[in-house]
């Protein structure tokens, strides 16, 4: 890592296999979300660090856990609908990033997948989501983009 890279930050996340993407899209459709996250953008964040770390992404396809429940994350006046994941794998990879010196902007890490970035005043849907298997195809990293908008 070069000294000039330190202020770039590190973003690390996972992408899902087709069966997992199909399941998330089916949830979006059943809930009739107004502006769902597109299939190619569905992911789960591992690390959102304002400092660059030497994170090494894993590239193997594997099951990493299961869906747990729906929740709304309120942030910057928006109400994002997420599926919380029961994933010791994601928790351990987040801890790996912390050991490498990653920063984190929130008090706790909650593995999740965002289904819609803003559901407005919509109530949390009552659909059961517990226990669906979640399989990733790979992890990836990129420089942190502090200007990113959904």
UniProtKB/Swiss-Prot annotation:
Similarity field: Belongs to the anti-CBASS protein Acb1 family.
Catalytic reaction(s) noted: 3',3'-cUAMP + H2O = U[3'-5']pAp[3'] + H(+); 3',3',3'-c-tri-AMP + H2O = A[3'-5']pA[3'-5']pAp[3'] + H(+); 3',3',3'-cAAG + H2O = G[3'-5']pA[3'-5']pAp[3'] + H(+); 3',3',3'-cAAG + H2O = A[3'-5']pG[3'-5']pAp[3'] + H(+)
InterPro entries: Acb1-like_C, Cyclic_Pdiesterase
Entry binding sites for 3',3'-cGAMP: 11, 73, 142, 148
List of residues binding 3',3'-cUAMP: 11, 73, 142, 148
Function as written in the Swiss-Prot or TrEMBL entry: Counteracts the host CBASS antiviral defense system. Phosphodiesterase that enables metal-independent hydrolysis of the host cyclic di- and trinucleotide CBASS signals such as 3'3'-cGAMP, 3'3'cUA, and 3'3'3'-cAAA. Does not cleave cGG or cA4. Besides evasion of the CBASS system, might also enable evasion of the type III CRISPR systems that use cA3 signals.
Name of the protein: Anti-CBASS protein Acb1
Annotated S-S bridges: none
GO biological process: symbiont-mediated suppression of host innate immune response
Catalytic residues in the record: 43, 45, 112, 114
Molecular function per GO: hydrolase activity
Organism: Acinetobacter phage Ac42 (Acinetobacter phage 42)
The keyword Cytoplasm is annotated on this UniProt entry: no
Keywords: Host-virus interaction, Hydrolase, Inhibition of host innate immune response by virus, Viral immunoevasion
